[in-house]
UniProtKB/Swiss-Prot annotation:
Its main location: membrane. It is a multi-pass membrane protein. The complex is composed of two ATP-binding proteins (UgpC), two transmembrane proteins (UgpA and UgpE) and a solute-binding protein (UgpB). The gene is ugpE. It comes from Yersinia pestis. Residues 77-268 form the ABC transmembrane type-1 domain. This is sn-glycerol-3-phosphate transport system permease protein UgpE.
């Protein structure tokens, strides 16, 4: 007998619609503010009808920055993209090779090495960040893409997830590869890597957003304005000297900052969902 859940379904849909509206309303307000001029954005209460100045504000910050910040926001977006993409590729490469070595290579203390990697998750960021900055400074990597990305490429979480996935692969695959004369890297490239594509897609999305949203690390590691990132740069656009903040331009910068991660999620959403589902099996 099929249970009649019409009332429950209606309630759930109403709650979902309310939740979506609560999430989208601040984004809509930011969009409206980005479309106003300098005088309209300070009117109280601010209008909720979009104005005609969106592209003008975007063009201004893209080439000239916001307010006294003369760094073009287009350059900040480029720095953020380079940082996020390098961190993503580095994390996935290091993690998948580490997990592959731990699962398929028989060497002494391999489980100990895995647990030493896993234990780094228990160290708070505040404990690790200042020693890392000192190392980067001693290597003369401040104000560089290498300094922005290299310390964030190691990931115990991704290594753990890849290890757990590799352990679910049947041993018959390895035995068949050995019979066919495939070496370790051939087995990895032709068999393990194609089977891991959904997990790779899920980790790519998660890691890209992680790298894109970095705020504290770029602030600590860079002093050159030309190496600033978008997320960290937005904070510098807000006036702290008593001068009015040009909120229309700040909101335009925030809208631009949202676009790259949204595009990544939309392009890879099918593989992303499949990767999350496969990782739970």
């Amino acid at each position: 007998m099929i249970e009649n859940r019409r009332g429950l379904d209606i309630f759930c849909h109403i709650m979902l619609i309310i939740g979506v509206l609560l999430i989208l309303f601040p984004l809509y307000v930011a969009f409206v503010a980005a479309s106003l001029d300098d005088s309209q954005v300070f009117q109280a209460p601010m209008t909720l009808i979009p104005g005609p100045h969106l592209w003008q504000n975007i063009s201004h910050i893209w080439h000239a920055g916001v307010g006294n910040n003369s760094t073009p926001f287009g350059l900040m977006l480029l720095n953020s993209f380079v940082m996020a993409f390098a961190i993503t590729v580095g994390k996935i490469t290091v993690s998948i090779l580490s997990a592959y070595a731990i699962v398929y290579f028989r060497f002494p203390l391999r489980n100990l090495f895995f647990w030493l990697i896993f234990l780094t998750l228990m160290l708070p960021v505040e404990v690790r960040i200042f020693p890392t900055i000192e190392v980067i400074a001693n290597l003369n990597l401040l104000d560089s893409y290498t300094g922005l990305t290299l310390p964030l490429m190691a990931s115990a979480t991704a290594t753990f997830l890849f290890r757990q996935f590799f352990m679910t692969l049947p041993d018959e695959l390895l035995e068949a590869a050995r019979i066919d004369g495939a070496g370790a890297m051939r087995f990895f490239w032709d068999i393990v890597l194609p089977l891991s594509k959904t997990n790779l897609a899920a980790l790519f999305v998660i890691t890209f957003i992680y790298g894109w949203n970095q705020y504290l690390w770029p602030i600590l590691i860079t002093s050159d304005a030309s190496m600033g990132t978008a997320v960290a740069g937005i904070r510098s656009m807000i006036s702290t000297s008593g001068a009015p903040t040009q909120w229309n331009q700040v909101m335009a910068a925030m809208i631009l900052t949202l676009i790259p991660p949204v595009v990544v999620v939309l392009l890879m959403q099918r593989w992303f969902v499949r990767g999350l589902v496969d990782s739970e099996k």
